[in-house]
Amino acid sequence: MTSVKLAEKNFEQDKEFAKAMHGDSYKKRGISALMAKAKEASDVATNGYFKHWDGGVSEDDEKKRLDDYSSLTKNYYNLVTDFYEYGWGSSFHFSRYYKGEAFRQATARHEHFLAHKMNINENMRVLDVGCGVGGPGREICRFTDCTIVGLNNNDYQVERAQYYAKKYKLDDKLSYVKGDFMQMDFEPESFDAVYAIEATVHAPVLEGVYSEIYKVLKPGGVFGVYEWVMTDKYDENNEEHRKIAYGIEVGDGIPKMYKREVAEQALKNVGFDIEYEKDLADVNDEIPWYYPLAGEWKYVQTLSDCFTIFRTSKIGRTVTTNVVGLMEKIGLAPKGSKQVTGALEDAAVNLVAGGEQKLFTPMMLYIARKPLDAK
């Protein structure tokens, strides 16, 4: 396993910074939440994130990002969470789509499919690694009636997840914990199941986060993950391929994108038995997973989806960038907000390119089990 320096746990400092930057904006959504940020603290987060992205793709550049994985990811989500919710909703992941199926329905089905493949039930205590603002957890809780603990390294997202759980009267089943998934503070063998939806990609080394998941799972417990990986078609030495991977990294707060084979080997190395693996982005679906970003209107299924697809399309993203730029100019939005939307635009363009060329998948599904006789 590649050697990575684990982050210092400065939880109180993180909490104070989140409070200074976000205040009570966790009770708001979208642009209104953005307008409620403390501008000086937002400037600190912007500088803290973009200092890592100057176009450098050398081994030294990558090592700096890998070593600063925790701060990089925290700053990223301090900056983009409100934009994500505005454009995409509270489940920060991609999905497969079928004709006649609305965007929100597809999102829920993608979450249900994972829970189904893992056989999650009401008697299980489940860990959601990298839980975001809790959208998938709320859906899986309703679907299975299980108890879920969400783990997140971003205080603002933890606050939002707690707020939503209480709002939707699920706080008896859902709880959220601040923590670094590379060094979890849970007791060993304390969960019946663990899942991660497009979250462990933020780990500097996949073997590191998978080993922590293995540790907290009970013997016989199941781990399910939708992993972001570069496919077998990706060539690290191909300049165009590397440009696409870098665009995904800078726009999505990822220290380094790894290939599929790295994820598979990492699971095996820590002791998991892989029971199921499938790239759900490579099954010849009529509607591609990236269509909302590509703005392919022919695939829009419902009237309500028109608003979502407009916001996520090239035209909608351009409108958002210009509006946010104007708000920043007149002091309604924090300094650097337009730079953030620019990074999200880079991400969208390269995610689509990676999807079209089948170089990248956001839904490499693994179902893996910790052996019953694990020590």
Swiss-Prot record:
Q: One Pfam family this chain carries?
A: Methyltransf_11
> Family, per the entry?
Belongs to the class I-like SAM-binding methyltransferase superfamily. Erg6/SMT family.
SUPFAM superfamilies this protein is in?
Answer: S-adenosyl-L-methionine-dependent methyltransferases (SSF53335)
Gene designation: ERG6
Q: Which reaction does it catalyse?
A: zymosterol + S-adenosyl-L-methionine = fecosterol + S-adenosyl-L-homocysteine + H(+)
Q: Which ranges of the sequence are coiled-coil?
A: none
**Record's keyword annotation contains S-adenosyl-L-methionine:** yes
Pathway, per Swiss-Prot/TrEMBL?
Steroid metabolism; ergosterol biosynthesis; ergosterol from zymosterol: step 1/5
State the organism of origin.
Clavispora lusitaniae (strain ATCC 42720) (Yeast)
GO MF term set: sterol 24-C-methyltransferase activity
Its BP terms in the Gene Ontology are: ergosterol biosynthetic process; methylation
Instruction: Report the protein name in the record.
Output: Sterol 24-C-methyltransferase
Q: Which UniProt keywords apply?
A: Lipid biosynthesis, Lipid metabolism, Methyltransferase, S-adenosyl-L-methionine, Steroid biosynthesis, Steroid metabolism, Sterol biosynthesis, Sterol metabolism, Transferase
PANTHER family assigned to the protein according to its UniProt record, in alphabetical order: HYPOTHETICAL LOC100005854 (PTHR44068:SF1), ZGC:194242 (PTHR44068)
One CC-aspect GO term: endoplasmic reticulum
Superkingdom of the source?
Answer: Eukaryota
Q: What is its EC number?
A: 2.1.1.41
Specify the enzyme's EC class, one word: transferase
